[in-house]
Amino acid sequence: MTRIKRGSIARRRRKKMCFFASSFRGAHSRLTRTITQQGIRALVSADRDRDRQKRDFRRLWITRLNAVIREMGIYYNYSKLIRDLYNNQLLLNRKILSQIAISNSKCLYMISNGILQI
């Protein structure tokens, strides 16, 4: 059997990886073997950090809510507010509540008073 030269196919694959790694620094954007290694590593980090980002934002929303609640003296703490929201079947998630708390804290005060009256 004759040897098959796969220059064009391999070049196309390397060119695709080179384009992906064009923003990397040093040899990570020039040498083929390190390009593939760093490309895999970058994709793994991106996958991991997408999940981490969700956790970080949830923590941020909870921290903001707790700070506003304690500052205004609405409730004793965040967990009691969330418990009463769920018991009264109010469908406001943490993201919306934290946006309300930052932009218009009086609205959050009205929501908490409504919960207390029920």
From Swiss-Prot:
GO biological process entries: translation
MF terms per GO, please? rRNA binding; structural constituent of ribosome
Q: Which InterPro entries match?
A: Ribosomal_bL20, RIBOSOMAL_L20_CS, Ribosomal_protein_bL20_C
The principal localisation class reads: plastid
Which superkingdom? Eukaryota
What transmembrane ranges does the database entry give?
A: none
Give the matching SUPFAM superfamilies.
Answer: Ribosomal protein L20
Intracellular or extracellular location(s): Plastid
- Keyword Ribosomal protein (UniProt): yes
A GO cellular component annotation in the UniProt record? ribonucleoprotein complex
Question: By its UniProt entry, which CDD domains does this protein fall under?
Answer: Ribosomal_L20
Keyword Ribonucleoprotein belongs to the record = yes
The record's keywords, sorted A to Z, are: Plastid, Ribonucleoprotein, Ribosomal protein, RNA-binding, rRNA-binding
- Entries under PROSITE patterns matching the protein: RIBOSOMAL_L20 (PS00937)
Stated role: Binds directly to 23S ribosomal RNA and is necessary for the in vitro assembly process of the 50S ribosomal subunit. It is not involved in the protein synthesizing functions of that subunit.
Q: Which family does it belong to?
A: Belongs to the bacterial ribosomal protein bL20 family.
Q: Tell me the HAMAP family matching this sequence.
A: Ribosomal_bL20
What's this protein's name? Answer: Large ribosomal subunit protein bL20c
